[in-house]
Amino acid sequence: MTERNPILQSLFDRKSVRVYEEKPIPAEMKQAILEAAAQAPSAGCQQLYTILDITDPALKEALAESCDHQPFIAKAPLVLVFCADCKKWYDAYLEAGCTPRTPGVGDLMLAVTDAAIAAQNAVVAAESFGIGSCYIGDIMENCDTQRSLLHLPDYVFPAVMLVFGWPTQQQKDRVKPQRCAMEHIVHENGYRTMDGAELRDTFGYKAGNAPFDQWCTAFCNRKYNSDFSKAVSYTHLRAHETLANL
């Protein structure tokens, strides 16, 4: 493979950072990160998201608790919540005298996608400054609590939360978790269901020296069947129902 250019190298090097130096992010860097997020592609160039810049220390503490009791969230110098926003265009249509339909599941999916793409733009921009980041999936758990904390109206859903900060040396030195081999990620011209042997080959590296079945069962219980996973799945269903029924 040819030598990677700086952008590619940054993408390959990027890993989640959860421990930060006690150093603020300069205002001009923060602004650049936010502006980069807004340059992300979006469905129909609608930018179906709203970014919440969390600066209130008390609110950071509350989010750290509501997002599975993770204190490092409150210590991060920059905390952003990317909301899937189906409200502002709906309100604009009403303002213009239109008779818009009620936002539905498809609108939510587009808005969540827009929010996630914008969030990743912010991550890449931060990496260019040497600023680390971590996605907080727990923002979708306890949705009623999060919506109350963030004063979210109908048709607005907390899709993505990101925390940013200057990584400590220990975080810089930490080995990035391995990714699956490309032949298991890329399918040509259509989806191909993998057989048991391929699945074991795909995820076997994660098991290390443990028997695959033993590792996979433990991982399933800890992740897929966990209370958090069930809560997030329930939250997604409720978000769809809320948009469909309001």
Task: Place the predicted regions along the sequence by residue.
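Generic N-terminal amphipathic, Lys/Arg-enriched alpha-helix
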Residues: 6-23
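Small-aliphatic-rich amphipathic alpha-helix that forms the alpha element of a beta-alpha
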Residues: 14, 33-39, 80, 103-149, ...
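Glycine-rich phosphate/pyrophosphate-binding beta-alpha loops
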Residues: 42-43
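Glycine/small-residue-rich phosphate/adenosyl-binding loop
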Residues: 46-116
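A contiguous pocket-lining binding segment that forms or flanks enzyme active sites
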Residues: 132, 136-194
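A conserved mid-domain beta-alpha-beta active-site/ligand-binding segment of alpha/beta enzyme cores
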Residues: 192-203
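C-terminal alpha-helical cap/extension of soluble enzyme domains
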Residues: 207-233
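Conserved small/polar residues in nucleotide/adenosyl-binding loops
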Residues: 235-242
